[in-house]
Structure formats: structure tokens, C-alpha cells
């Protein structure tokens, strides 16, 4: 169990799964830069991040910007939305002070793009589900994404594999945070979409040393 002082931002687990160096630059050195993708994501979340907004649509209720945390993972953050689905079975349900009955909580994340080929988004969603499980002593079987580009909802099963990835990522994040060491860059196709590319300088790794990088890129 991690203490309150040791908690890390849950949203960082997506950055970490995408690239450990990107996560460390953001969370250890407070580096940030914008690109088209980050700006589009912010615009989408302007319509989501209202903690006082509650929506009842049919049988289910949507809560916005819900605070969540896990001492076991050492992560805290805010879920874009939690959908409360009515249930006649009290198993794995929660109660809400304003809405009588038993409710199955489903974490929902809003993303501006479309489903990715890797599981970086799913890992973040699984971490949110695991926070809810710890907070309410329940089992959360699935979560969902709403992707702005395709205007479509995608449900995701919170599998044992995703849970293992979350635990391993959280453990590694805490180890790096304690060491204060920035991981080396690992250049790949993912670098092209990273807003920190000009700060990270992944090309340096291809040069072997700083002198070679300066000769090939700055002093030529």
C-alpha cells in the first residue's frame, strides 16, 4: 500500500504505456508542449469535465469527473465519467445517495481519435476500473470508450492481462519516480505523434553520443 504522499497521477499510466520517457519528462521534469492531437483532446474534454453534471438517460445515470484512487496501485485521478447501470442483483453494485437502488458502475473515457491498435487506452481504463474495485470492494467487469472521431462507443472487457499490465506499469512508474532518472528514448513510429518530440530528441539515441549528434545535426 502506498501512502498519500506517494500517489501518482492515474492519467500518467497512458503516457507511460505509450512511452516511459514521455511520462517521465511530463511528471518528473514538468515538460509539456501542444500539438494538434493534444489540442483536439482538450476541446473534447471541455464538454466532459463538469463534476456537477449528472445525466439520467433512460435507466442509467452518468456522473462526470469522478475522483478515484487506489492505494494498492498508488494512483489517483479523475474518471471522465462513471455510468451507473441499474441492477436487480446486489452483487458488485454500489448505492448512490441521490438515486435509490443498486447500480453497476462502468468507467467511461472520452478520446478524440479512434480505437488504437495497441492497448494504451485500455490500460488507463483498466486502472480506473481497479480503483473503483478497491474503493467499493466490488468487481468491475468492463468499461467503455467514446471516440470523437468515429462518434462511437466501444466497450472493453477488463481482462486479467490488462490488470497485470496495470500493476506492472504502476510498479515501474513508482520506481522511476523514486529514482528521478529519465529513461532513455526509444525511437519509433510513435515518436511522430508525440507532442514532446522536440524536447525528447529521440534522434540522439541513434547517434551513439552527444558529439556525433552535434556533428550530424547542428554543426554540419
Region spans (language model):
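Metal-dependent nuclease catalytic cores that hydrolyze phosphodiester bonds in DNA/RNA
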Residues: 1-107, 207, 216-220
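Short, charged low-complexity intrinsically disordered segments located at boundaries
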Residues: 44-47, 53-58, 155-163, 195-207
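Nucleic-acid nuclease catalytic cores
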Residues: 77, 83-180, 192, 196-198
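Non-catalytic alpha-helical scaffolds and adjoining flexible linkers that form interface surfaces
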Residues: 4, 135-137, 179, 202, ...
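Short, intrinsically disordered, charge-biased short linear motifs at domain edges
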Residues: 3-6, 172-188
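Alpha-helical structural motif
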Residues: 9, 16, 20, 124, ...
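Cysteine-cluster motifs in flexible loop/terminal segments that predominantly coordinate metals
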Residues: 19, 181-220
Amino acid at each position: 500500500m502506498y501512502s498519500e504522499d506517494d500517489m501518482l497521477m492515474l492519467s500518467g499510466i497512458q503516457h507511460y504505456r505509450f512511452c516511459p520517457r514521455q511520462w517521465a519528462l511530463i511528471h518528473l521534469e514538468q515538460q509539456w508542449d501542444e500539438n494538434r492531437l493534444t489540442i483536439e483532446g482538450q476541446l473534447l474534454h471541455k464538454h466532459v469535465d463538469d463534476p456537477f453534471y449528472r445525466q439520467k438517460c433512460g435507466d442509467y445515470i452518468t456522473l462526470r469527473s469522478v475522483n478515484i484512487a487506489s492505494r494498492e496501485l498508488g494512483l489517483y485521478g479523475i474518471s471522465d465519467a462513471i455510468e451507473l447501470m441499474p441492477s436487480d442483483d446486489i452483487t458488485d453494485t454500489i448505492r448512490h445517495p441521490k438515486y435509490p437502488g443498486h447500480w453497476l458502475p462502468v468507467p467511461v473515457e472520452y478520446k478524440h481519435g479512434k480505437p488504437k491498435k495497441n492497448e494504451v487506452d485500455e490500460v488507463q481504463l483498466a486502472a480506473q476500473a481497479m480503483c473503483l474495485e478497491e474503493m467499493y470492494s466490488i468487481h468491475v467487469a468492463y468499461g467503455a470508450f467514446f471516440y470523437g472521431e468515429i462518434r462511437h462507443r466501444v466497450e472493453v472487457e477488463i481482462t486479467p492481462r490488462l490488470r497485470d499490465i496495470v500493476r506492472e506499469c504502476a510498479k515501474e512508474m513508482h520506481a522511476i519516480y523514486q529514482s528521478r532518472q529519465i529513461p532513455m528514448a526509444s525511437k519509433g513510429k510513435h515518436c511522430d505523434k508525440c507532442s514532446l518530440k522536440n524536447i525528447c530528441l529521440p534522434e540522439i539515441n541513434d547517434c551513439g553520443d552527444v558529439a556525433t549528434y552535434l556533428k550530424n545535426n547542428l554543426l554540419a
